[in-house]
């Protein structure tokens, strides 16, 4: 089982049923304050923390007096618009006194499905975490439709973990893990502490353990675990209703851990390496040597650009003699790459008319 305090980066998913009292519709302020203490402890140990938080619709429906019944799409989106403000304020109020800066990120499925938006989102996470902030992510329920929805925050948390390169994803739930059967219906159901491989049998064990305010049952959690572990991120499902749930998990609280067989970096490299290039960048000798030392590819080291590619597309990296030396995701489209090739990075704003990124291909986005 992984240690949260030993991880480089952790994503924590918080469900509506934990954050909002299902009877009153009020925020569980004491629970949130205790969670903030856990976050501060992890940050103090050098671990980056990203929160994926439900709760906007649950908070907003009470303010708009929408009752306990099913909401129409328009009602849900209105509740989300009202609730997001209250949700962001609640996190700010518990994190700021601990010296932590909170940041809100609202995503739709397109932000991970579209490669260019994926890279933008990944860069935003990196910039926030480098400055010590705690990103708080939710699905953009105000504008998302069925076609561009994650559908549940278990799936969203797994995708955020992949985008951000997290080591561990923790799903705080109203259950303490996966059982061989639904423990509410079967007294012989056995708890599964560790799952190394998600088999069809494991998926079949995932019954519906949803609660009144949550969308995701156990099945969505297992599917999320499949996404996360394939990208090198271990996942834990654990009881979140208790005070200080992250500290409890690190102290050995009951949970189901889904193990990852590779690191996030290895999984990402394999993903990039399997792509088909849509263009190529020819490098000078100095740039080729710099890449071999683990550096990013700067525009100054590019002598030729071929192909018709867009920002975020895979491109072949070539030595001066044309031999392939790797593949990477371009941070510029072909037209922009042609304009800035051979130029210093500080010349990019003048050439393109906007402040671009210094690297043409970042070292984290290439395989040699």
From Swiss-Prot:
GO CC, any one term: cytosol
Record-linked Gene3D superfamilies: Acetylglutamate kinase-like, PUA domain
Subcellular location(s) per record: Cytoplasm
Cited SUPFAM superfamilies: Carbamate kinase-like, PUA domain-like
Pathway as given in its UniProt record: Amino-acid biosynthesis; L-proline biosynthesis; L-glutamate 5-semialdehyde from L-glutamate: step 1/2
Function: Catalyzes the transfer of a phosphate group to glutamate to form L-glutamate 5-phosphate.
UniProt-recorded name of the protein: Glutamate 5-kinase
Organism: Jannaschia sp. (strain CCS1)
């Amino acid at each position: 089982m992984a240690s949260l305090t030993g991880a480089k980066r952790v994503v924590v998913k918080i469900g509506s049923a934990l954050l909002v009292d299902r009877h009153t519709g009020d925020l569980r302020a004491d629970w949130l304050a205790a969670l903030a203490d856990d976050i501060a402890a992890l940050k103090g140990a050098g671990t980056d923390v990203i929160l994926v938080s439900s709760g906007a619709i649950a908070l907003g429906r009470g303010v708009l007096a929408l009752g306990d019944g099913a909401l129409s799409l328009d009602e849900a989106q209105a509740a989300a618009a009202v609730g997001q403000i209250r949700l962001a304020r609640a996190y700010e109020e518990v994190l700021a006194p601990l010296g932590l800066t909170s940041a809100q990120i609202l995503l739709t499925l397109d932000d991970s499905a579209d490669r260019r938006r994926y890279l933008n989102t990944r860069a935003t996470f990196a910039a926030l975490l480098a400055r010590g902030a705690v990103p708080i992510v939710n699905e953009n329920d105000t504008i998302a439709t069925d076609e561009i929805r994650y559908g549940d925050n278990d799936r969203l948390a797994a995708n955020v973990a992949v985008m951000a390169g997290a080591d561990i994803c923790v799903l705080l739930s109203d259950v303490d893990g996966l059982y061989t059967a639904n423990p509410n219906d079967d007294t012989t159901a056995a708890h599964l502490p560790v799952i190394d491989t998600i088999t069809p049998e494991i998926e079949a064990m995932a019954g519906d353990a949803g609660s009144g305010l949550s969308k995701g049952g156990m099945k969505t959690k297992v599917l999320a675990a499949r996404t996360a572990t394939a990208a090198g991120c271990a996942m834990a499902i654990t009881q979140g209703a208790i005070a200080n749930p992250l500290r409890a998990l690190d102290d050995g609280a009951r949970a189901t851990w889904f193990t990852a067989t590779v690191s996030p970096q290895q999984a990402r490299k394999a993903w990039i390496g399997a792509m088909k290039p849509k263009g190529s960048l020819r490098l000078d000798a100095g740039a080729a040597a710099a890449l071999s030392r683990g550096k990013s590819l700067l525009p100054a080291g590019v002598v030729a650009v071929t192909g018709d590619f867009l920002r975020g597309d895979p491109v072949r990296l070539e030595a001066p003699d044309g031999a392939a030396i790797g593949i990477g995701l371009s941070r510029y489209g072909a037209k922009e790459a042609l304009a800035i090739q051979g130029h210093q990075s500080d010349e990019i704003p003048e050439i393109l008319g906007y402040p671009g990124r210094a690297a043409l291909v970042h070292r984290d986005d290439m395989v040699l």
